[in-house]
Amino acid sequence: MMRLPWFEHRAPKSVQEAARILAGEGPNAMLIAGGTDLLPNMKRRQMAPKVLISLRHVSELKRNGSALGAGTTLTEIVNKKELPLGLRQAAHQVATVHLRNMGTIGGNLCLDTRCNYYNQNYEWRKAIDFCLKKDGEICWVATASKRCVAASSTDCAPALMALGARVKLVAASGEREVALEDLYNNDGIDYLKRRPDEILTEVSIPSGWNSTYWKLRRRGAFDFPVLGVGAAIRFSGDTVEEARIALGAVASRPFLVEKASEFLKGKKLTDEVIEEASRLVASRAKPMDNADLDLYWRKDVTAAFATHALRELRGDDMSEARLRIARQLV
C-alpha cells in the first residue's frame, strides 16, 4: 500500500492568509485545492511537502462574476452553460465524475507535467536510478538532454489559451495578471512561471469567441491527454476575423500555434483552408516518447484533430466523431 508521507495541514480562510502562510513556509509548503493529482503524487514520493495549505475553505476562490474563481470545480464548469463551449468540453474530458467534483480549474491549470519514467512508484523509479525530474541526473526519454521533457497534462489550458484567457496571481507582496500563455515554461521541471509564493486566484475569459476542444487519450473512459487541440474563432459573417489555436500534451507546456492562427485570418473555412491550417498546426507538434501511443502517430494525428476542431467551428455536424473519440457530446 502506498501511504501519504507525514505533513502539516493548514486551512486558511482567505487568499491573503494563504499567501502569508505560503510566504512564511517557503519551499517546505505546497498548495492543495482538490488534491486529485497532488495526493497520488505524494503517495509515489514524487512530492513530499512538509506543509499543505488547503484552499478549500477560501470562499474568494469560488466566486464567479466577471472572472472565474480558481476554486471552481470542473463539474461546476461543465454545468455552467454560459461558459465557452471549448472550456466546458475540456473540463468534461478530465478524469471521471468523482474527480471532476473535487478537481478545480486552478489546479488543472497548474497540473504537474507527466512522463512514463516519472509517474511511477518510488521503487520503480529507484530501480532505474530515478530520472532528471526527480532524484536523478538523466532524462531517460532524451539521454543527451539537460532539460526535462515531461509533457504538459492539462486539458483546460489549451482550451482557455485559445480563448485568450488571463490569470491573476496573488502573493503576500502583491498581485499581477498575465496572459495564460505566459504562465508556462517549456521545461518539464520548471514548467510554471508562477513564483513559489504566488497563488492563482482567478481566470478572466474574453467574450465573443466560438470555441471547441478535442482530446486524444489512450482510454476512452478517462485518461490524461496525449494530444489536446483548443481552437477559437471570431467570425464576421462566414469570414474568420480572428483565430487562436493551441496545442497541449505535445511539449512541456501548452502553446499557441501562431502561424495557423494568422493564416486563418480573413479567410472562409473552406476544406482547402482547413487542410492547410491543420497542416500548420501539425508542423508544431513535436511529441516525445514519454507518453502512451506512438510518438510519430501522435504527431501525424494532430492534423486530423485540428481538422475536426475547425470543421466543428465551421458548423459541421461532428457529433459522430466526437462520440467515437471523446465519448461525450458537451
Residue ranges and their predicted role:
Residues 1-330:
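C-terminal structural segment of proteins
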